[in-house]
Amino acid sequence: MRENIGVIWLREDFRLLRNYALINANKNHKKLIAVYAYKEKKFIDKKGQKWWVYKSLKNFKKDLDDYNITLQVIKTDTYKSFFEKLIKIKNISLYWNRIYEPAYLTFDKYLEKKLKFHKIDYKIFKGNVLNEFNDVKKNDNTPFKVFTPFWRVAEKIHIEKVPSPDTKI
């Protein structure tokens, strides 16, 4: 168990089961903090989304409290400014689940470079997908172009990896 603090960056994954960032941080750290970076500009014209995030965070906080994990919602203008502050805290390990939209993937690459430069431990896990992009390939190691053969292989891989439904952090 590491003495430093495990920080789980919450993005769109407010669940305990199969939340690989949360599960791995919990295995490796005595103290955990879950952080949601709230960008107010993101929700200006999206009252429904804002309501959903509020309710989801409120419910998720109750779940995290059962495991003595603190949830902090931090208001920020940009993810960059949020992480500039976070990087100044040296005694942390950062965990998050990937989001597969281009802007998020680009930011993840930027953040990885920053964290490496500042020698901050981090781990990224698959998000809300059954398989990562490169997990499912044909025998010749090239990507599938037809769905049915892809699904047969993906299903086989997924069935082998599924944890028990009663597995909790």
Residue ranges: model-predicted function:
Residues M1-I159:
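Trp/Phe/Arg-rich N-terminal binding region typifying the photolyase-homology
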Residues K161-I169:
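Substrate/cofactor-recognition hotspot
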